[in-house]
C-alpha cells in the first residue's frame, strides 16, 4: 500500500516532505513515492539514511504554487507534482495522496482525476478538533468558500457517516455553525440550511456557536469553507500564542520554573492535544480515493503522521466502507432533502 507524497507542495518543500517521508518509512514501514523534481529530491534524500527503506521518486516537472489558481493543477500544469500524485493513484501505482501544497489545487486535482463519490456535489476538507469530551469533526475547513444549502446539507450527511463509521461515534450529534443558537440568527444560507436539517432523520442539534466546537457539545460541526478555514487558522494561532505565553510566564521567575517541574507532564499532554501536527492533515471527504491535505507550514512530524494516517485509511478500507455507506444512506438522506426543500419552499 504505497502513499504518493507531493514533495514540492508546502512552505518548506521539499526538505520537510522528504524527511517526513523518511521518518514514516522507517517508523511504520510504509512504501512511499516522492513526486517532484527528481534532482532536488535525490539531493534531499542523500541527507538521510534510507538504506532498507522503500522510497521511490517519480518525476514531475511543474509545481502549483500557493498563489496559483486551483484550476492550474488540472488545466495548465498537468505535470505538476500534485496532479501527478493523483495520477499515480488512478493508475494503481499508489493508494493515497498526501500534500501540504495549494489546498484548492489538491481538491481540484482530486475531483478531476479520481472523481467524486456518487451523489456528492462538492467534497469537503474535514478537520478533527480536540475537545473537553474527545473530538469534534468540522467540515468544511477550506475547500468551498461559497456554498449553497445543498452543499451544507451534504457536508452534514458526509460528516454524520464519517463520524459514525470512521471515528466510531454511535449516534453523531450534528450542529450548524452560526452566530447564535436562536433560529432567527445566522444569514440566509444558514437559516435555509437549518430549516432543512431539522427535518432530516439524524441527530441534528440546531445552531452551535464557535465555543461549542471545543466543549464537545456536538460531534460534527458544519460550515462553509470560508468560515471553517477562519476557525481553523484562529484555533492554530490561539494554541501557538497560549503556548508562547505559558513559556514566557514559566521563564519569568525562579518560583515559576520550580512550579513547572511539578506540572511538566500535564503541560506536555496539553501541548500534544492541541498540536495540529499530531493529526497530520485533514482528509478530503467525498472523492473516490484517499487524500490528506496538510497545513502549508507543516513540519516533519505533521508530514509523517499524515502519511501514517493515509496509509491506515487504505489498510482499514475506510474509503470503501465510507463509499458503501454513502451510496445507501446518502441516497436515503437526499430523498428526504428533496422532500423537505419542497416543503420549506412551499
Curated annotation (Swiss-Prot):
Reaction catalysis annotation: a fatty acyl-[ACP] + phosphate = an acyl phosphate + holo-[ACP]
NCBIfam families referenced in this protein's UniProt entry, alphabetically: plsX
Molecular function terms, GO-annotated: phosphate:acyl-[acyl carrier protein] acyltransferase activity
Quaternary context: Homodimer. Probably interacts with PlsY.
Described function: Catalyzes the reversible formation of acyl-phosphate (acyl-PO(4)) from acyl-[acyl-carrier-protein] (acyl-ACP). This enzyme utilizes acyl-ACP as fatty acyl donor, but not acyl-CoA.
Record-linked InterPro entries: FA_synthesis, Phospholipid_synth_PlsX-like
Pathway where this protein functions: Lipid metabolism; phospholipid metabolism
Record protein name field: Phosphate acyltransferase
Subcellular location: Cytoplasm
Example of a GO cellular component annotation carried by this entry: cytoplasm
HAMAP family with a match to the protein in the record: PlsX
Species this protein is from: Geobacter sulfurreducens (strain ATCC 51573 / DSM 12127 / PCA)
Similarity section: Belongs to the PlsX family.
Source organism phylogeny: Bacteria, Pseudomonadati, Thermodesulfobacteriota, Desulfuromonadia, Geobacterales
Alphabetical GO biological process terms: fatty acid biosynthetic process; phospholipid biosynthetic process
Source organism superkingdom: Bacteria
Keyword line: Cytoplasm, Lipid biosynthesis, Lipid metabolism, Phospholipid biosynthesis, Phospholipid metabolism, Transferase
EC number: 2.3.1.274
Amino acid at each position: 500500500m504505497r502513499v504518493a507524497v507531493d514533495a514540492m507542495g508546502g512552505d518548506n518543500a521539499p526538505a520537510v516532505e522528504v524527511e517526513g517521508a523518511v521518518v514514516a518509512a522507517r517508523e511504520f514501514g510504509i512504501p512511499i513515492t516522492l513526486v517532484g523534481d527528481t534532482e532536488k529530491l535525490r539531493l534531499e534524500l542523500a541527507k538521510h539514511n534510507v538504506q532498507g527503506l522503500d522510497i521511490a521518486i517519480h518525476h514531475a516537472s511543474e509545481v502549483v504554487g500557493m498563489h496559483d489558481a486551483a484550476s492550474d493543477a488540472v488545466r495548465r500544469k498537468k505535470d505538476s507534482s500534485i496532479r501527478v500524485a493523483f495520477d499515480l493513484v488512478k493508475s494503481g501505482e499508489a493508494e493515497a495522496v498526501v500534500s501540504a501544497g495549494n489546498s484548492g489545487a489538491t481538491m481540484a486535482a482530486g475531483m478531476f482525476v479520481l472523481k467524486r463519490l456518487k451523489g456528492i456535489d462538492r467534497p469537503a476538507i474535514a478537520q478533527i478538533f480536540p475537545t473537553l469530551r474527545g473530538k469534534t469533526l468540522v467540515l468544511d475547513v477550506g475547500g468551498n468558500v461559497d456554498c449553497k444549502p445543498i452543499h451544507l446539507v451534504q457536508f452534514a450527511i458526509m460528516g454524520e457517516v464519517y463520524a459514525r463509521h470512521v471515528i466510531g461515534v454511535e449516534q453523531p450529534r450534528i450542529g450548524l455553525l452560526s452566530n447564535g443558537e436562536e433560529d432567527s440568527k445566522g444569514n440566509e444560507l444558514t437559516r435555509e440550511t437549518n430549516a432543512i436539517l431539522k427535518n432530516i432523520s439524524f441527530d441534528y442539534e440546531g445552531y452551535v456557536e464557535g465555543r461549542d466546537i471545543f466543549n464537545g457539545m456536538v460531534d460534527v460541526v458544519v460550515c462553509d469553507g470560508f468560515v471553517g478555514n477562519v476557525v481553523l487558522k484562529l484555533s492554530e494561532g490561539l494554541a501557538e500564542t497560549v503556548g508562547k505565553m505559558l513559556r514566557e510566564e514559566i521563564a519569568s521567575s525562579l518560583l515559576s520554573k520550580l512550579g513547572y517541574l511539578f506540572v511538566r507532564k500535564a503541560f506536555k499532554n496539553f501541548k500534544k492535544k492541541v498540536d495540529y501536527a499530531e493529526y497530520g492533515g485533514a482528509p478530503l471527504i467525498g472523492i473516490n480515493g484517499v487524500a490528506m491535505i496538510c497545513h502549508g507550514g507543516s513540519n516533519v512530524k505533521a508530514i509523517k503522521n499524515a502519511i501514517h494516517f493515509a496509509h491506515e485509511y487504505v489498510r482499514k478500507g475506510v474509503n470503501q466502507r465510507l463509499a458503501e455507506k454513502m451510496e445507501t444512506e446518502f441516497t436515503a438522506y437526499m430523498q428526504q432533502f428533496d422532500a423537505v426543500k419542497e416543503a420549506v419552499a412551499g
